């Protein structure tokens, strides 16, 4: 069974900050990358094209916004939770997930196996949070590891405690 790891990049006050080389390394080591529509558009526009060509990318979306018809991008529409359960059950490997919408989908449906939080030592302010969702699966999350990485960033890995 595949493991789904949600990556969250946040400021000290919980606001979103851009992903960095930690995400790139996780994406390189994974079976595929899972993102939401907003993250897909942001990545595409920031790079003036699609930079994630080595891996299949799954984009959870309400419709088709395909700007990358020649790349390895697949759009997950309809019942995304059911499709992700099917993908998770098929084979081995890690799915690297990123984006607030993706995080909400995974956590609200009990699909995330691990959460990797990179906390950047800045205060951003504002109402938007890096992860805005309710944890509806009723499971407890425990810290599996925590360490200071370069530039004072803190990498914390949380894992589910299975009932």
Question: Where are the model-predicted features located?
Answer:
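Enzymes that bind and transform nitrogen-containing heteroaromatic metabolites
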Residues: 1-163
